Design a protein with these regions (language model features):
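A generic local secondary-structure boundary/capping motif
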Residues: 43, 127, 225-228
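Short, polar loop motifs at secondary-structure junctions
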Residues: 30-31, 55-62, 98-103
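Terminal domain-start leader segments
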Residues: 1-52, 88, 150, 154
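Short acidic-hydrophobic, aromatic-tinged amphipathic segments that line or gate anion-handling sites
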Residues: 66-80
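Short, compositionally biased "basic patch" segments
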Residues: 44-67
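Acidic/histidine-enriched ion/cofactor-binding microenvironments in catalytic or ligand-binding pockets
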Residues: 48, 86-88, 195-237
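Flexible, acidic/His-enriched mid-domain "rim/lid" segments that flank
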Residues: 4-10, 79-204
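Conserved beta-strand termini and adjacent loop/short-helix elements that scaffold enzyme active sites
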Residues: 27-28, 56-58, 71-74, 95, ...
Length: 237
């Protein structure tokens, strides 16, 4: 990820922090680390309002850089900030809607003199307005999808079930560069790659907050295809 792009994204968050009087953010969830650091790490990005972002990492252990610091536990973050002569925040934001309660309490406890607030809505607001590079990434993704969809009619053969058709579509997507992982927001939300529905299964309700339902293959993931045969004259979603 280009550093100017990361700075632009971080500054979008900072501008919203200013409006709420927040001095710093401590970011650790994967999607937000990708947004602010460019990749997933086991660790924390400390984003102060008026100085460069600092990465405190546990894994991988081969990260280098002026603003990167290896740690074994988050309690070391405060010690490093003090060693560097950096002021501790008076108002800190954490990813309150995403962190487990115990981790939220632990991270908040690192800064006992700070007011700790939920920063998830603020980060989501910053991410909702896409940068030029993000828009270009959408365009490239759309082109890859279009190439895969062009091949879908050729993946069908008579006698297929919905799950077999779904597997073939997934194969086409992977060949066009799909990583095969999908991140979804929400405590009880789960998602898999693609959803092919046909017949009565298309009207089967799902507990998930998605547009499509389906019985699925197992109660452990009640959604999507359920081995319904694809029949002539039936719609396929």
């Amino acid at each position: 990820m280009l550093q100017p792009e990361l700075k632009l994204r971080r500054d979008k968050i900072r501008s919203l922090m200013v409006s709420q009087g927040i001095d710093a953010a401590l970011i650790t969830c994967n999607a937000n680390l990708i947004y602010t650091y460019g990749c997933v790490v086991s660790g924390y990005l400390y984003l102060p309002l008026h100085s460069p972002a600092l990465l405190f990492f546990k894994r991988p252990n081969n990260i280098t850089g002026e603003h990167s610091f290896p740690i074994r536990k988050p309690e070391q973050i405060v010690d490093i900030l003090k060693e560097k002569g950096l002021p501790l925040p008076t108002k800190l934001m954490l990813e309150g809607d995403e962190l487990p309660y115990t981790e939220y309490v632990r991270l908040a406890g690192l800064f006992p003199d700070a007011e700790v607030v939920n920063g998830t809505p603020l980060i989501r607001q910053a991410r909702s307005v896409k940068t030029a590079i993000e828009i270009e990434m959408f365009r490239r993704s759309g082109m890859a999808h279009a190439k895969a969809y062009e091949q879908i009619p050729f993946a069908y053969y008579p006698g297929m079930t919905d799950i077999e058709f779904s597997i073939e579509i997934e194969r086409l997507m992977r060949l066009q560069g799909c990583l095969g992982i999908f991140r979804v927001f929400g405590r009880s939300m789960e998602i898999f790659m693609g959803s092919v529905l046909t017949g009565d299964n298309a009207g089967y309700p799902s507990p998930y907050d998605f547009a499509l339902g389906g019985r699925g293959l197992d109660p452990a993931l009640p959604g999507g295809a359920d081995k319904t045969p694809l029949k002539e004259g039936q719609s396929v979603m």
